């Protein structure tokens, strides 16, 4: 089963790394064989540390050039999936803050 997560983010990169690990654990438990992240960076003012592998799963980061807000960032992520990723079974939308469990 292929599951794609849309995750809008604004500056909270540390929480996103934790969420990525939680998604990885959940994917093993649920036996999802293909999991991807579409991370929509809503013009964060803090840079992502790219010196190490930031996420436990394959991911695409969409960098917006201006802050669009949470809902618009989600919409952009969904549009990206519709245009670029055609072979998925489910799309799950999660905020990066870790309040929701994967």
Residues covered by each model-derived region:
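Hydrophobic targeting segments
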Residues: 2-7, 16, 23, 35-40
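Donor nucleotide-sugar binding loop of glycosyltransferases
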Residues: 12-16, 44, 101
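Short helix-capping segments at alpha-helix termini
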Residues: 27-32, 54-58, 85
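Short beta-strand/loop segment that forms part of the nucleotide-sugar
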Residues: 32-43, 63
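A conserved acidic beta->alpha catalytic loop
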Residues: 41-50, 98-99
């Amino acid at each position: 089963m292929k599951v794609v997560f849309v995750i809008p983010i604004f500056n909270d990169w540390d929480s996103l790394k934790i969420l990525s690990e939680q998604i990885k654990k959940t994917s093993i438990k649920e036996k999802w064989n293909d999991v991807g992240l579409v991370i929509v960076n809503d013009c964060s003012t803090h840079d992502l540390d790219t010196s190490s592998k930031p996420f436990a799963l394959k991911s695409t980061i969409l960098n917006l050039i201006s802050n669009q807000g949470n809902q618009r960032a989600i919409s952009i992520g969904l549009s990206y999936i519709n245009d670029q990723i055609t072979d998925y079974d489910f799309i799950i939308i999660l905020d990066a803050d870790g309040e929701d469990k994967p």
